[in-house]
Amino acid sequence: MGRAFEYRKATKLKRWGHMAKTFTRLGKQIAIAVKAGGPEPENNPTLRGVIATCKRENMPKDNIERAIKNAMGKDTSDYKGMTYEGYGPHGVAVFVDTLTDNTTRTVADVRSVFNKFGGNLGTTGSLAFLFDHKCVFTFKKKEGMDMEELILDLIDYNVEDEFDEDEEEGTITIYGDPKSYAAIQKHLEECGFEEVGGDFTYIPNDLKDVTPEQRETLDKMVERLEEFDDVQTVYTNMKPASEEEE
């Protein structure tokens, strides 16, 4: 299934963490989308994608509408997407994706965790070569659909030929070039796919083996980072736990 499949499979269920934190992070994404393209989903592709993700994460409709309304009434222009990267314990690369209105606070918070766990926060871009930046779309599967044909249609947007299928949820997830986000979303919607949720992710291109004890320490570091409201997602190049470890 390729180098990234086991990582994606292992991280899918823990993509957003606890529900309350999930809604906070999605609310911030709604605010950014509204600020950039307005409050009407039909005229704002980015907002449509976020709302579809909200629905998939079981965010109540009232919460979504309130987040849009709040975004219209406050200044969200100071929110910035910032990434922080470095090495955690045992030489594992750690990539922290944030949305913040105070970079001084955020970098101090992130650095404190790296220091606490004996890691080293590097400069922006220093570990970018270890991760592939991708846009990711999840949508409802159509009965009798031909995935090979769909992937072929999207080849100009550098969509990977590998995809994830969740039979229980009846969804397909594809990965492509971040620069082609809007074009991929438009194509999927024009093809009649429902609940097209869009996002961005970082996938490690070289997974590092760790012992169960090392994994426990690294998991604690990731959990500590995810406690900060500014942190959207934490990525590592730690190899997923085997079934024996679990």
Curated annotation (Swiss-Prot):
Keyword S-adenosyl-L-methionine tagged: no
Molecular functions (GO terms): DNA binding
GO cellular component: cytosol
Listed InterPro entries: Integrase-like_N (IPR017856), TACO1_YebC-like_2nd/3rd_dom (IPR048300), TACO1_YebC_N (IPR049083), Transcrip_reg_TACO1-like (IPR002876), Transcrip_reg_TACO1-like_dom3 (IPR026564), YebC-like (IPR029072)
Entry's Gene Ontology BP terms: regulation of DNA-templated transcription
One of the Pfam families matching this protein, by short name: Transcrip_reg
Localisation per UniProt entry: Cytoplasm
Record-linked HAMAP family: Transcrip_reg_TACO1 (MF_00693)
Record-given protein name: Probable transcriptional regulatory protein BVU_3469
The species this protein was found in: Phocaeicola vulgatus (strain ATCC 8482 / DSM 1447 / JCM 5826 / CCUG 4940 / NBRC 14291 / NCTC 11154) (Bacteroides vulgatus)
